[in-house]
Every structure is written in structure tokens, then in C-alpha cells.
Amino acid sequence: MTSRPRFRDLLSLVALAIAAVVPATISAAPPPGIPDGWSDGFVYANGIRLHYYHGSPATGKPVIVMVHGVTDNGLCWARLTWKLQDQYDIYMLDTRGHGLTDPFTSTDNGDTLIKDVVDFVRAMKFEKPILMGHSMGGATVIRIGAEYPDLAKAIVVLDAGIGGMGGGRGPAAAPGGPAGAATPAATPPAAPPRSDNMPFAMSGNPETLAAQNNYKFDDLVAKGRRQNPKWDIVDIQYWALSKQQYHGAYNDETFRNVMQGSMRTADALAKIPVPMIILKADAPPEQRKAHLEAAKAMQKGKLVHIDGAAHNLHHDNLPRTVEVLHEFFSTL
């Protein structure tokens, strides 16, 4: 005679079934690592330890050094690098105060981020690399082109302000509110933030920025998906990771004097002697006209608007971005 299973046995079976299923459904996904075939490293430059990523090695091919924007990291270039790395040897910097690079110091000023990149190029012994920058990184490479005219072979700028500081930007890459609603300073939330309520400050006291680093990766990814429906999941994941790593500007003075200070490009466009291209986000006719007028100052350059793309145009419209870059590179 077969006995019926006891109630306690049934509970045990149910518990085992739940244990087998629940970890797969509620466990947090880990942040992504370095893409296959890539490497990373550190170099001492301009008084700090700079961290960089290196795409699949392309020895003997032209070098590109990529410089990201505020609150991002070097991996935010991943998908664009995949499209270019067969023809170019690509290095992606973590800017000071970002990613795994050392933080800002009390002696930094508006020239510091520019000198970081210049000293990185020299420390790595690159001969006339192509310099590419997005947003704040775009302003950085503009200034390098003007202030160190013999350093680069060409300058590539993705949606940086031109002719001054900032301006002309579409949505940025911060996770507070609509993409780009990050504020110079904010107060840490009293309760653990939900993925739809995650304020993010570009500067502030250390406690504020450290609290942001504790945002859950899955929550950042969920917010990134909602804010940026055009982005590939790879872009969103590295964007989320960069927000967990951001450790820049522990006071508003550093943000103004160093980060914003690096973006004061003024009349730099007219001083750049090497070939240059500026990719701008989509914009209304009057703004496009103003951009093209400012671009006339370039000696050997042009400006192209990327239709349908906002500030992070290499995420919003990667195919068109790559097409424009290949056309430009073919002229070098």
C-alpha cells in the first residue's frame, strides 16, 4: 500500500522548487566586463594614474584616442569602437574623476583635463593619433587641437559646444529625469531610490556622489531603457556602469573651474591646423544654421548634423555616425 505524501514533505518540495526559480528571477545582474579581445591598463600622466581601455589590438594601424563626456567612462565608446577597430588601434580613456581613473585634486584647473590627454598621448608614445571626443571630451580635443597643434593627425568632435562653453546640446547621459537632467548638486534620497526616481548630481559633497554609486545596476539599466529607447542594450549597460563609477567634482568649485573650465573653447576652432569634423545632434533649422555659421571658423573642417539623434548621437544613430566617420577618415 502506497502512503500519501505528508504535508511536511509537500512543503519541502515546494520550497525546493521556489529556490530553483527565484534566484534566476530576482538576483541582480552583474555589470558587464571588458569586451572579449579587449584589454585595459593604467599610465601615470599629468600627476595621476589614468585608466584606459584598448580595443582589439591593431598593431601598425592608425591610433584613435577617445575621450568621453561628463559622468561616462571609456566603455561608453564600445559599440562605436567595434565598428572601427578593424581599421584603427583604439584607446578609450577614463577621464579624471570618472571610471577607474584617479579623482580630481585641489590644484586642478580648466587646463587639467586637456593636459591629461596630452600627457597620455606622450606617455604612450603615440605619433599623431586621431583624437575623438564626445561632449566635454569633444571640447577637450578641440582645445588640444588649438593649443597643441602638432600633437594630433585629426580632430573628431561629437556634439560638443562650439565657440564657447557648452550650448547646443541635446539630452545628456545622466540618469536623473529625462536624459540630461543631471544637476550640478543634489541631496541624497532619504529612502532607497526606485528606478523611476534616481536623482543624479554631477557635483556635490562626497556623501552625495557616493550614494549615487550605490544605485543598483538593474535599476540604472531599467531607467536607461526608458529614457533612451533608441539605444542598444550594450550602450545602456555601460552607461549604467559609468554612473556607478563616477567620482568627479566633490564640490561645485571643481565642477565649475575644472570640468566646465575645460569646455571654454572660445575661438579655438580657428586655430586648429589639422583636418577636423564636428558631428552635431539633430536640431531645428535655426540652430543648424547657427552651428554651420560657427563651423566656418575651421581651417580644414566641416560640420555634419546626425538626423534623428540627440546628444549621444553615437548611441542614437550609430550607422549614420559610422558612415560619416568613414567618409572623413578616407580623406586623411
Feature-to-residue mapping (PLM):
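Catalytic active-site module of serine/aspartate enzymes centered on a nucleophile-bearing elbow/loop
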Residues: 301-332
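Active-site loop/oxyanion-hole signature of alpha/beta-hydrolase fold enzymes
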Residues: 46-48, 53, 95-132, 136, ...
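Conserved loop-alpha-helix segment in the C-terminal half of the alpha/beta-hydrolase fold
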Residues: 275-309
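Alpha/beta-hydrolase fold catalytic core
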Residues: 2-15, 22-62, 87-88, 127, ...
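Short N-terminal helix/helix-N-cap motif within the alpha/beta-hydrolase-1
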Residues: 74-82, 100-103, 139, 165-166, ...
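Conserved hydrolase catalytic core segment
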Residues: 127-174
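Conserved HGGG/HGGXW glycine-rich cap/lid loop of the alpha/beta-hydrolase fold
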Residues: 54-100
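Conserved alpha/beta-hydrolase catalytic His-Asp/Glu region
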Residues: 167-168, 174, 179-271
